[in-house]
Regions:
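Residues that line or immediately flank small-molecule/substrate-binding pockets and catalytic motifs
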Residues: 24, 53, 106, 176, ...
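Short acidic/His/Gly/Ser-rich catalytic and metal-binding motifs that mark active-site loops
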Residues: 15-17, 113, 180-185
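Flexible mid-to-C-terminal extensions adjoining Fe-S/redox cofactors in radical SAM and related proteins
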Residues: 230-231, 237-414
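Radical SAM enzyme [4Fe-4S]-AdoMet core and its adjacent flexible, acidic
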Residues: 120, 124-125, 132-257, 261
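Short, small-residue-enriched loops and turns at beta-alpha junctions
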Residues: 26-28, 55-57, 149-151
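Canonical Radical SAM [4Fe-4S] cluster-binding loop centered on the CxxxCxxC motif
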Residues: 1-33
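Cysteine-centered iron-sulfur cluster-binding motifs in ferredoxin-type domains/subunits
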Residues: 8-16, 55, 269, 275
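Radical SAM/AdoMet-radical enzyme domain recognition
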Residues: 35-50, 59-176
Length: 414
């Protein structure tokens, strides 16, 4: 199976997104603490590692840990805002170290929207420069986009622009905003879209990508809002292929292993033909409305077949659809898949408490992730003061708590 692990290299950032899922913490890494995490993923037999953050390019030893992960045989990827990657010498250094693929986050090709979402001016031009620099260095380039209230109506516009001006970008990842963690949790009115807000724009974007011969994945969008492209759902692909992921969080959560991908459903979802392979509503019904969900009636095995026969996917292969059915049924019976989906009541509430559902979805693993030092604490406090000033200037709220931040992120999985 093509399991991918995540290492949060840092948790600070040079941007200030009002919906950030993994904001600043006092934890820090050095090379040795990251090396242990790379070894952990190798020991698990994982295919690759995604270096993420915060903004991973801010760590001074990023090229060294990339080189180590590549030497250990991992396919090394990185998620970045692109601010530093636009430096062609830096991009070349990362390529030489073994970085194979980079996900550059671009939320909108409208400069004013991108600046508002990033909390900084000039970010769009730097992201475009990062695309070009990475491509020139021989790094495969993907684009990540978090779907939110400010870009929900023009996702297809961004695709059209990027195809025209950066034609070497061949893969896109769409992440529907998770409003249950980080700053998004306290700024829902500003950033969380309704599912219907982006349905048409997303469909147009995916159609454009498909017709241009590009690939794409979509995260945290229920299949009733992307039925034609159900095979491209990240959660659906993980459910079908019985995959897991490990995230080495640089906060109080530390290392977690996720093996289940189903979340919240409306009562009507029980009749849906795609229910067994749908991730449902990611936020457990606290911001999105389960009333927006509706059953669809299409051939589920047609979706499964397209996922299993994908020639670009390095996952395990089943010898036949019948063999997959047996494994899938056994996994569901054993609780590895599908045991944790909550059902929304008539009032939209979940039958599961948030903490219970999280415990069912995420299993802790005892691998130490970073540490809190006196210097790290001082830097954290200084960053929090600076971020507080930015939040006030932008009219957004700071996240709840201090060190812990939530249980997921925009992953960029392919």
């Amino acid at each position: 199976m093509a399991n991918l692990g995540y290492i949060q290299v840092v948790r600070h950032c040079n941007h200030f997104c009002g919906f950030c899922s993994n904001p600043t913490t006092p934890y820090t890494h050095d090379f040795e603490s990251m090396r242990v995490l790379v070894d952990d993923l190798v020991a698990r037999g994982y295919f690759g590692v995604i270096m993420t953050g915060g903004e991973p390019t801010l760590h001074p030893e990023l090229p060294r840990i990339v080189a180590y992960a590549a030497e250990r045989g991992l396919h090394v990827r990185m998620i970045t805002n692109g601010w530093r990657l636009g430096d062609r010498a830096f991009a070349a250094e990362l390529a030489a170290a073994g970085l194979r693929l980079v996900h550059v986050s671009i939320y909108s090709v409208r400069p004013e929207v991108e600046a508002r979402l990033r909390g900084a001016e000039g970010t769009l031009g730097r992201a475009f420069a990062a695309l070009d620099a990475a491509h020139a260095a021989g790094i495969e380039v993907n684009v990540n986009c978090v779907i939110n209230r400010l870009n929900a109506d023009h996702l297809d516009e961004s695709v059209r622009y990027l195809i025209a001006h950066h034609p070497f970008v061949r893969h896109f990842v769409w992440n529907n905003l998770d409003p249950s963690m980080g700053r998004a949790e306290v700024n829902q009115e500003s950033f969380v879209p309704r599912l219907a807000d982006f349905e048409l724009s997303l469909h147009r974007a995916l159609r454009l990508l498909e017709r241009s011969g590009r690939s794409f994945r979509v995260e945290k969008v229920p299949l009733c809002y992307m039925t034609e492209f159900a095979w491209a759902s990240t959660e659906t692909r993980k459910i079908v292929k019985l995959e897991e992921r490990v995230v080495h969080f640089l906060d109080d959560k530390q290392t977690v292993r996720q093996t289940e991908w189903e979340h919240l459903y409306a009562p009507g979802c029980a009749a849906c033909s795609l229910r067994p392979i749908c991730g449902g509503l990611f936020d457990r019904g606290e911001a999105y409305d389960p009333a927006e969900l509706a059953p669809v009636f299409v051939d589920m095995e047609g979706v499964v077949r397209r996922i299993l026969e994908d020639p670009s996917d390095p996952s395990r292969r089943w010898s036949s659809l019948a063999a997959w059915r047996r494994d899938f049924a056994a996994a569901r019976a054993g609780g590895d898949v599908g045991a944790s989906g909550g059902v929304a009541g008539d009032d939209g509430s979940s039958e599961f408490r948030r903490d219970v559902l999280r415990d069912m979805q995420i299993g802790a693993v005892s691998v130490p992730v970073g540490r809190v030092t006196a210097r790290g604490r001082r830097l954290y406090e200084a960053r929090r003061r600076s971020e507080g000033e930015k939040a006030e200037a932008l009219g957004v709220q700071m996240e709840r708590g201090a060190a812990a931040s939530g249980d997921g992120e925009a992953t960029g999985e392919g």
